């Protein structure tokens, strides 16, 4: 116990300690962050302004966009600030907050994707009961349950992680405070901690994943029984974006928690983290805007209206 020291801050090693490369990473992260910010903001605005999209599916999509924006905002701004100021420091409590909110947004995101699968199941397999089962109160309660489950899951993960002692080692081989890397700095054997973290993650993931799979099996069986090709295409078009988003989230989430911590190549850790911490919130708006006809129309109308307003204003000023 005499060799233990209190850790008051962590060093986020990130990608490189070379100033020129840090500026390059700052520019790349800024572009990715702005793409995610603009994409999710357009989704939210387009749905809010289009009365035809005021239904449960798009209500959940607004929640997803908010969670996506929070998810990427937990890690990217701090990393960009460190790169710009040529520093690697983050305070102990700053690291605690980053871990808490990162797990919160990730867990709530997955819970919401599960709810969205249920919404598509009711819409396609039980259309006559859709308005009764997916009324406004039910939708608000389901969305709230996703956010609350994120808080509970995050509290468990964060509490388990920071209950351990750090023996003076404070260098985190990542561009943000990541649980597997923090457990690697533990004084005592962190094997039990890693098992608890991975077990909790896998339990939540398996429950949600099983629910999503069962929902889509029923959806596909129902869609294949639709006699008209146009009807089948319309049903698939509302499900395909969600299915792609779920696959992307699960694929990248598997990288996050199942990659080895002790034997992983340090140079690859930040690059792999980009895959699961930046790509989903950046790609989700693109997937929904490209694969959903109603969303594409709403976005085109929104962007066209803004361009028209700008042109009209410029003509008026001249």
Where are these regions (language model features)?
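Transmembrane helical core of 7TM receptor-like proteins
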Residues: 1-318
């Amino acid at each position: 116990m005499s060799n233990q020291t209190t850790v008051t801050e962590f060093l986020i090693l990130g990608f490189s300690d070379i100033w020129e490369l840090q500026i390059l990473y700052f520019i790349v992260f800024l572009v990715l962050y702005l793409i995610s910010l603009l994409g999710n903001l357009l989704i939210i605005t387009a749905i809010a302004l289009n009365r035809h999209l005021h239904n449960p599916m798009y209500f959940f999509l607004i929640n997803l966009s908010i969670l996506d924006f929070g998810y990427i905002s937990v890690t990217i701004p701090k990393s960009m600030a460190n790169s710009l100021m040529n520093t690697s420091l983050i305070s102990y409590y700053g690291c605690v907050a980053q871990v808490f909110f990162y797990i919160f947004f990730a867990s709530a995101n997955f819970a919401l994707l599960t709810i969205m699968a249920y919404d598509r199941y009711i819409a396609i397999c039980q259309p006559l009961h859709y308005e009764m089962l997916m009324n406004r109160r039910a939708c608000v309660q389901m969305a709230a349950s996703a956010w609350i489950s994120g808080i509970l899951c995050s509290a468990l993960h964060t509490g388990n992680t920071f209950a351990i002692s750090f023996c003076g080692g404070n260098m985190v081989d990542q561009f943000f405070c990541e649980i597997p890397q923090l457990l690697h700095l533990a004084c005592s054997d962190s094997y039990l901690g890693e098992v608890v973290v991975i077990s909790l993650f896998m339990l939540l993931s398996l429950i949600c994943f099983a629910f999503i799979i069962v929902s889509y099996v029923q959806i596909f069986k129902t869609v294949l029984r639709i006699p008209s090709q146009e009807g089948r295409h319309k049903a698939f078009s509302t499900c395909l974006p969600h299915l792609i988003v779920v696959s992307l989230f699960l694929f990248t989430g598997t990288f996050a928690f199942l990659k080895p911590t002790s034997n992983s190549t340090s140079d690859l850790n930040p690059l792999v983290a980009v895959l699961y911490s930046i790509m989903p919130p950046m790609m989700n708006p693109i997937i929904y805007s490209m694969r959903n006809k109603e969303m594409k129309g709403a976005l085109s109308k929104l962007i066209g209206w803004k361009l028209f307003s700008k042109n009209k204003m410029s003509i008026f000023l001249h």
